[in-house]
């Protein structure tokens, strides 16, 4: 039985599928905020859903209840929503929800069914991770991919190829299976300062700027530039008023600068 439910079947132009979700790999809300911003800025329209409620840990991602005058009016279960945006260069399919506690293989089948239905051959996931990086330096971004072409683009843009061994998120599972299916796929990760695990529009902006460059699509990021500037101003004021925090930032700046000096540049 398919977990994909479509409300409509529009004709799409070379659609790119972008996936983001809350959970373990959403530091700074980078993943969820990126998808929310794309839905709003692109005027995305509801396309369907993935029936995954039974695969979500409801103690971690609880249903939303509406109670009025002592009566329950609605209980809305968490799930996965699908939106689409029609564009001049390439259409977007936006898939968002919460990391599943199990049944990842069922999710992948539904996701690939969605992509096959609309002829999407390119997939992007967006994640956020906590890192020893200061907010006063350029946002550090890393990636993993299935494609030598996308690898070259990411390296040329200054992104760091991921090196990691440990518990996997759904991102890795999605990218791995995309490679097995022969899709061009890339997972972009925004690095969030250890002392700032709060909604971070600055990192979201950096991720979406690079997404635009890697895939050669235009994105409207004007509001994010404003949000990031306001965020920076507030964080700078906070740091200036806290000597301990100021020392943490100084130490991370030195560490960041040393790593950048020792970094090997990439020539495509």
Predicted feature descriptions by range:
Residues 1-99:
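N-terminal short beta-loop-beta anion/metal-coordinating cradle
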Residues 132-214:
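Catalytic cores of processing enzymes, dominated by hydrolases/peptidases
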Residues 29-33, 102, 106, 165, ...:
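Conserved active-site and cofactor/substrate-binding residues in soluble primary-metabolism enzymes
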Residues 196-268:
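A conserved C-terminal secondary-structure "cap"
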Residues 48-54, 122-127, 222-225:
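A generic structural motif
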